Amino acid sequence: MLGLAAEENVLRIHIDELVFGLIAFAVIFALVYRYAVPRVTKMLDERADAIEGGIERAKKAEAEAEELRQQFQEKLEEAHRSYAAELQKASEQSAAIIAEAREEAQAEARRIIEAAHAQIEADRQQAMAQLRAEIGALSADLAARIVGETLSDPAAQSRVIDRFLAELESGANQQAEVR
């Protein structure tokens, strides 16, 4: 019987222990609820705020980065446009300089050619004058030898020389026409 009585005690619930256990549980629950829960809640709220703040800061940083990227892209495009404009301007200036240099070279070439023609004409006139003088002297000597008298009158010498040269030129022109 002892064994049976002992088994009954094990299954039997003692009210005083149950009440004491419930009171102890309620006190511990109240203390945890009063002191620990607010601290944990506060810590969780702070952590949530920190996470939300981090997310907001990340979004802000991302927005700022995007804005900076767009500004950089705009400046880069502006630099490309400016470069293209400067390149076009330099190309136009070089074309203008080349055209101006070409015109100056052509003008200089025309001036040199005209000066050469003028010099050739002056040399020809000078040679003709010298030739006339020499031919005149030679023809006067020749006429004096043939006729036997000298042409001392300069006007007469000039007429003889002019007539002789005219005959030479007409003979040269006739030969040129025959060819």
From Swiss-Prot:
<keyword id="KW-0472">Membrane</keyword>
<dbReference type="GO" id="GO:0046933">
    <property type="term" value="F:proton-transporting ATP synthase activity, rotational mechanism"/>
</dbReference>
<keyword id="KW-0812">Transmembrane</keyword>
<dbReference type="InterPro" id="IPR050059">
    <property type="entry name" value="ATP_synthase_B_chain"/>
</dbReference>
<dbReference type="GO" id="GO:0046961">
    <property type="term" value="F:proton-transporting ATPase activity, rotational mechanism"/>
</dbReference>
<comment type="similarity">
    <text>Belongs to the ATPase B chain family.</text>
</comment>
<keyword id="KW-0375">Hydrogen ion transport</keyword>
<feature type="transmembrane region" description="Helical">
    <location>
        <begin position="13"/>
        <end position="33"/>
    </location>
</feature>
<dbReference type="GO" id="GO:0005886">
    <property type="term" value="C:plasma membrane"/>
</dbReference>
<keyword id="KW-1003">Cell membrane</keyword>
<keyword id="KW-1133">Transmembrane helix</keyword>
<keyword id="KW-0406">Ion transport</keyword>
<protein>
    <recommendedName>
        <fullName>ATP synthase subunit b</fullName>
    </recommendedName>
</protein>
<keyword id="KW-0066">ATP synthesis</keyword>
<comment type="function">
    <text>F(1)F(0) ATP synthase produces ATP from ADP in the presence of a proton or sodium gradient. F-type ATPases consist of two structural domains, F(1) containing the extramembraneous catalytic core and F(0) containing the membrane proton channel, linked together by a central stalk and a peripheral stalk. During catalysis, ATP synthesis in the catalytic domain of F(1) is coupled via a rotary mechanism of the central stalk subunits to proton translocation.</text>
</comment>
<comment type="subunit">
    <text>F-type ATPases have 2 components, F(1) - the catalytic core - and F(0) - the membrane proton channel. F(1) has five subunits: alpha(3), beta(3), gamma(1), delta(1), epsilon(1). F(0) has three main subunits: a(1), b(2) and c(10-14). The alpha and beta chains form an alternating ring which encloses part of the gamma chain. F(1) is attached to F(0) by a central stalk formed by the gamma and epsilon chains, while a peripheral stalk is formed by the delta and b chains.</text>
</comment>
<keyword id="KW-0813">Transport</keyword>
<dbReference type="InterPro" id="IPR005864">
    <property type="entry name" value="ATP_synth_F0_bsu_bac"/>
</dbReference>
<dbReference type="InterPro" id="IPR028987">
    <property type="entry name" value="ATP_synth_B-like_membr_sf"/>
</dbReference>
<dbReference type="GO" id="GO:0045259">
    <property type="term" value="C:proton-transporting ATP synthase complex"/>
</dbReference>
<dbReference type="InterPro" id="IPR002146">
    <property type="entry name" value="ATP_synth_b/b'su_bac/chlpt"/>
</dbReference>
<comment type="function">
    <text>Component of the F(0) channel, it forms part of the peripheral stalk, linking F(1) to F(0).</text>
</comment>
<dbReference type="Pfam" id="PF00430">
    <property type="entry name" value="ATP-synt_B"/>
</dbReference>
<keyword id="KW-0138">CF(0)</keyword>
